[in-house]
Swiss-Prot record:
Keywords carried by this UniProt record: Ubl conjugation pathway
SUPFAM superfamilies: UBC-like
Organism: Trichoplax adhaerens
Job of this protein: E2-like enzyme which forms an intermediate with UFM1 via a thioester linkage.
Active site: 116
Stated family: Belongs to the ubiquitin-conjugating enzyme family. UFC1 subfamily.
InterPro entries: UBQ-conjugating_enzyme/RWD (IPR016135), Ufc1 (IPR014806)
Protein name listed in UniProt: Ubiquitin-fold modifier-conjugating enzyme 1
Length: 168
């Protein structure tokens, strides 16, 4: 079941057409352009809705992505480094998004801080190859993961807001 807000968000993210990964040289350049258009549109939409929650950039080849993501809980902003590599089998395989500083702090995470998307997101990705891209991974993967995990980690005292730790 997908709620209406998720449907609206998803509908506003451009779908991709090119089935190409990093090993596909010229086709990868085309796919990367589609990825950037989709990401830019998603970020623009988020800003319009006052829902800006991540920044991403990539290496020159578009195979390694990194940046920051954040989640606001109880009016406090929790910010994390985010990183992922584009798999060689992309877009057939979704990227494994990692939040390295949360490594080992929740059961819904694999070694290296890779967030668990196996049960919900990966089957959805598989049904939508090659239409889904990085923006979709952020919107349907990392975003919902943060919304579930960060409040839980805060309530359990596993993560503490930076201002609280510096004032103690």
């Amino acid at each position: 079941m997908v709620d209406e807000a998720t449907k609206r968000t998803l509908a506003a993210i451009p779908l991709l057409k090119t089935r190409a990964g990093p090993r596909d040289k010229d086709q990868w350049v085309g796919r990367l352009k589609e990825e950037l258009v989709s990401l830019i549109k998603y970020v623009e939409n988020n800003k319009k809705q006052d829902n800006d929650w991540f920044r991403l950039e990539s290496n020159k080849e578009g195979t390694r992505w990194f940046g920051k993501c954040w989640y606001v809980h109880n009016l406090l902003k929790y910010e994390f480094d985010v990183e992922f590599d584009i798999p060689v089998t992309y877009p057939g395989t979704a990227p494994e998004i990692a939040l390295p500083e949360l490594d080992g702090k929740t059961a819904k995470m694999y070694r290296g801080g890779k967030i668990c998307l196996t049960d919900h997101f990966k089957p959805l990705w598989a049904r939508n190859v090659p239409k889904f891209g990085i923006a979709h991974a952020m919107a349907l993967g990392l975003g919902p993961w943060l919304a579930v995990e960060i409040p839980d980690l805060v309530e359990k005292g596993i993560i503490v807001h930076k201002e609280k730790t510096s004032s103690e």
